[in-house]
Amino acid sequence: MPTEAPPLVVHLVYRFDTGGLENGVVNLINHMPASAYRHAVVALTEVVPAFAARIRRDDVQYLSLHKPPGHGVKLYPRLLQLFRELQPAIVHTRNLAALECQVPAALAGVPVRIHGEHGRDAHDPDGSVRRYQWLRRAYRPFVHRYVALSRELAHYLEHRVGVPPQRIAQIYNGVDLTRFDRGSATRFAPPGCPFSDPALFVVGTVGRMQTVKAQPLLAQAFVRALQMQPALRERLRLVMVGDGPLRADAQAVLDAAGVRDLAWLPGERADVPDVMRGLDCFVLPSLAEGISNTILEAMACALPVLATAVGGNAELVVTAGKGQTGRLVPAGDVAALAAGLIAMSADAAAAVEMGRAGRERVERQFSLRSMVASYQSLYDRLLAERITTRQPA
């Protein structure tokens, strides 16, 4: 007698390409037992094959809808047909750009409809834009459960969008503690990086170079730190890994200051753990964040963190006391970021101790195993409730 196939989860995103949100989908699919759920990834715009190749399961279906800019109401008939063909047990949309897809999912009778809030963009860094609040309220009746990646986002959903707290699950991102590991107390430069001298203090960041990530601000802060303390030219170095529209801007800042040879901007790299192991301090200059995967990855690699005080960063980085893991500075404040770079580089021993505390913190609270178990438990529970009641949650 043939075995019944596991329930299907459709993960619906705007674009399936390099990014923290998308990497979370990859981790979820790769580490959730195949016997529990099948998966499909639907991108409103495009599934990028090179990124999709990170998924190790060969039974995952990928669909690109090539949506033009603007409201996606013209896609509703196609999505309605798609959901009826795929017959998913769960549709899981992520962030505002995909939220409207809850409407055709509801019309298709999808049993469980989940929406994840992973963070904000540069147009609404603090969640105060009323139009975005209104849009979320408009689609609220179509969503059974929300997943907020941080306590700050859960508070936003409850108090700005009006979602009852019992309909919000707060699940932190998790990090692969085996893949992201310091491995050695010694810093090793990744292939191609010119900063192998152990006497150097190497600061760096990893991420797509777009407005919300604000990498040019880090380049400006690096230049400012060297201007404030010229002796740092002998040992302070900058690594900025990633590609995107702001890469040229960041490089231009460094070139204009005459410090091109003190920085390395190699573009996008697949060997992110090796990049992390080539740093002494991880820096995240973002204007907005949910729960940053790269902060968690840096902490797993025993790196101290210098980040902006936005979104869920304060929930990750401990800034005082015995278990201090890093420092937080105001977003957009080049002077404060420069001061943070100087402070980190001035006390290498303290930086190492912060990194050690960070590794211990992610081991306790932010493991990938815990994240996957939380999502699987949510899927199981909601599906059981819907099968039992067949009533709106």
Predicted regions and their residues:
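Short hydrophobic beta-strand element within catalytic cores of glycosyltransferases
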Residues: 43, 304-307, 317-318
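A short helix/loop element that forms part of the nucleotide-sugar donor recognition site in Leloir-type
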Residues: 180-197, 202, 388
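Conserved acidic donor-binding segment of nucleotide-sugar-dependent glycosyltransferases
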Residues: 316-334, 343-348
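Aromatic "clamp/platform" in nucleotide-sugar-dependent glycosyltransferases that forms part
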Residues: 268, 287
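Donor nucleotide-sugar binding/catalytic pocket of nucleotide-sugar-dependent glycosyltransferases
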Residues: 141-185
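Nucleotide-activated donor-binding/catalytic signature segment of Leloir-type glycosyltransferases, i.e.
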Residues: 251-267
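A short, well-ordered alpha-helix in the C-terminal region of glycosyltransferases
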Residues: 343, 350-365, 371-377
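A conserved mid-protein helix/loop that constitutes part of the nucleotide-sugar donor-binding site
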Residues: 19-27, 201, 205-227, 245-252, ...
